Each structure stands twice: as C-alpha cells, then as structure tokens.
C-alpha cells in the first residue's frame, strides 16, 4: 500500500492516478525507475536535492506532498475505471479541504477530467479551485508518457514560480 504524504500548510500536493506495481511492491510513490517524478520536481525547483522514492517522506521538508485518485495498483493507469476515478475525485476534494495546500497538481489532463467530471482541460492553472487551493494540471511524469523531460520540467517550474510569486 502506498500511503499519502500530506500535512497542513504545504505549497503543493502532487496527485497521481494510482500506484503502479513497482510502487505497490515497495510502498513508495513514483517508484518505477522510468518514472521521472523525482528528477522533474527537483529540476523544477520544488526540492533542494533529488529525492529517491524511499525518501518520499522528506517531501514534507520541502512543503510538498503526494496523493492519488485510486489506491488500487495496476500495470498501467488506463486500467483504472472511470467510476474509480470519480469516486477518487470526491475523496480527493475531502483531503484537500482538510489539508488546504496552496496548490493541487493533478498529473495528467485525463486524470483531471475523469476525477472531477470536467471537459476540455488545458495545461496549467485551472479556474476551478477547492476552497483557496489552486488546481493545476501538469503532464504525468510516467515513463510511458512520451513528453520530453525538459518539457515536464518547464511545466512543473511554471507552478513553482507561480507559488514563489504568491509568497509561497
């Protein structure tokens, strides 16, 4: 089981779809060697050093957290059913209302659209909020996503810089 890493007063909570088998096997988020999450958040400015999956709890040292829509592990995220995403979206709203991070970063357009019953999502900051929490849609860092690492870093850096401008 991959546990959430959450606390109050975080700058950002990154929300994945569900754990892959590598994460489920280790208990750490974004554990597959091809997943670029840890590299990207470091290069984008969220962490002072590149953490390893087994150091995930140290995200809190940088006022970052992680969660997911669905707890059930799968080989690929496309194995998650729409109803699981919708149910996960309701639970995610409750978590965000409780912890109130400055921003929630949903990793993937389809995840945002399915989890929150939205259509036509664009990358970046959304008009939808959860209380005072901004919602951002960022590309998923999975190794299965063909987007170049540089483009991932650019998208994530936009969020980091926006939070800095907001004094966070």
Curated annotation (Swiss-Prot):
Q: Which Pfam families match?
A: UDG (PF03167)
Q: Which UniProt keywords apply?
A: Cytoplasm, DNA damage, DNA excision, DNA repair, DNA-binding, Hydrolase
Please, one GO biological process term?
Answer: base-excision repair, AP site formation
NCBIfam families, per the entry: PRK10201.1
Q: Which organism is it from?
A: Citrobacter koseri (strain ATCC BAA-895 / CDC 4225-83 / SGSC4696)
One GO molecular function term of this record is: DNA binding
- Note whether DNA damage occurs among the keywords: yes
The listed locations are: Cytoplasm
Protein name as it appears in the record: G/U mismatch-specific DNA glycosylase
């Amino acid at each position: 089981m991959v546990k959430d890493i959450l606390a109050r007063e975080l700058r950002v909570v990154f929300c994945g779809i569900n754990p892959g088998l590598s994460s489920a096997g280790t208990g750490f988020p974004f554990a597959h060697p091809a997943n670029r999450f840890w590299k990207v958040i470091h290069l984008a400015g969220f962490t002072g050093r590149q953490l390893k999956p087994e150091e995930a709890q140290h995200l809190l040292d940088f006022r970052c957290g992680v969660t997911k829509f669905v707890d059930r592990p799968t080989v690929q995220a496309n194995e998650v059913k729409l109803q699981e995403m919708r149910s996960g979206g309701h639970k995610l709203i409750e978590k965000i209302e409780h912890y109130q991070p400055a921003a929630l970063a949903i990793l993937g357009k389809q995840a945002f659209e399915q989890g929150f019953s939205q259509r036509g999502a664009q990358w970046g900051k959304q008009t939808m909020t959860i209380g005072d929490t901004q919602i951002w849609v960022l590309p998923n860092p999975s190794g299965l996503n063909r987007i170049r690492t540089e483009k991932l870093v650019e998208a994530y850096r936009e969020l980091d810089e926006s939070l800095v401008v907001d004094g966070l």
